[in-house]
Amino acid sequence: METAKFVEIFKENYTAVSEIANNYQEVRKEIINEFFKNVKDILENDLKDKYSIELNSVAYRPIIIKNTTSQDKKWKNFYFTVEFQKSSMYSMPFVGFRKDDDKEVKVSDFDKPNITQLEEQTKYFLAYGKLFDDDICKNIIVDKLSPEDFAGTIKGILEQFEKYNLVERN
């Protein structure tokens, strides 16, 4: 849109434009928090017998999912999460299995699980993948990313995880 058109809109809607500009980040945060609350509700309804699900609205890691039933003690060192690489902008969300910071474990001591969508590994992530490069708020509003679809993606990854036997390197 041309600058002249923006000026015209600004003049006609000064109060609304000013409020939007002043509250832009807070409104984005609220949209994202509501989205993840809905994702949590869906996941809890479907997975409550196997997983504990926590929300964290102030951090770059808005949702944390821990397996509560796995008999494999090695998996207790990791949890599933969504983590924003640009936390202040809620951009570049990664999903994957992150090491628990409270546990004395090295990711490099384990083989990377063969889980679709989680192709990478770092010193913090046992396995992770990037969902999209963009701002999640834009994906929610413009691309109509729904909590149901996002929860479905997470459930699909967790189903693969349940079948995987974590292998510790010698």
Question: What kind of region is each of these model predictions?
Answer:
Residues 11-136:
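Polyanion-binding interface signature
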Residues 1:
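Contiguous mid-protein beta-loop-alpha structural module that forms a pocket-lining wall or clamp
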